[in-house]
Amino acid sequence: VARLLVAPLLIALEKTIGSSEYLQFMKSFKYPLSGEFSFRRNVLSELRISSDWGIEVGVLSEMQRNFSPNNICQVDLADTYDHKHQDLSLDDETKGLSKMSIDIIKTFIKKLATQGNSFSRETFRSLKATYYRCALDMIDIYRSDATMNGLQFDSHTEEKAVELFAVNIMKAGDDFYVNPMDTPFIPTWSRVKSAIPDFLTKLNKAVSEDNKDNS
């Protein structure tokens, strides 16, 4: 998804709505969907976290909004990674990589909308076409890399994924129009403490009791 959706989508967004500090920031990450983050504790209280597969993109977006880029970095924690693959789910947009792609696209759309960008149906059609061309160009690059390194490369499967993601750009756009009041974040810890002042005490007690039961 990072190779075939996020990377070409960011390029397509730049071409469609114009470059911005936000898009440049997101493009700077080698693995924007790694799912591994480390923060100082004071950062978490005001962090608005997405409640779906857009969580990685959402967290990076919040960090870019709230902090200077020189306070943020990416690191390699290991030489190898145990990547958990999911099915493409061509026939069911509520599962697998299909749902993941829709959630990620919606997260980008909502983040850019909060920055004053307007999205019309024509914008989404242009974005879909631009993404598709960019993604196919990147597949050519990946194929060449695989050939140079003596690796097998399944062009058919790669292009099937790109075709699905292109369709899902329109689906994400339709959902953006149909559900304009959809809340994209779970409440921040600051809001939780404001609504339930003793929540953290109760949470700490519940975790302690749960640990006792499992010990």
Language-model-detected regions and their locations in the chain:
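Terminal low-complexity segments of carbohydrate-biosynthetic enzymes
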Residues: 87-215
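Active-site donor/metal-binding and catalytic loop motifs
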Residues: 73-94
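A generic structural signal for short hydrophobic patches within well-formed alpha-helices
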Residues: 43-44
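Acceptor/aglycone-binding surface of glycosyltransferases and processive sugar-polymer synthases
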Residues: 1-37
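A conserved catalytic-core signature of glycosyltransferases
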Residues: 32-34, 38-39, 50, 54
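Short-chain dehydrogenase/reductase
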Residues: 3, 53-57
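Catalytic donor-sugar/metal-binding loop of nucleotide-sugar-dependent glycosyltransferases
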Residues: 51, 61-80
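Conserved, well-folded catalytic cores of nucleic-acid-processing
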Residues: 11-16, 66, 74, 104-111
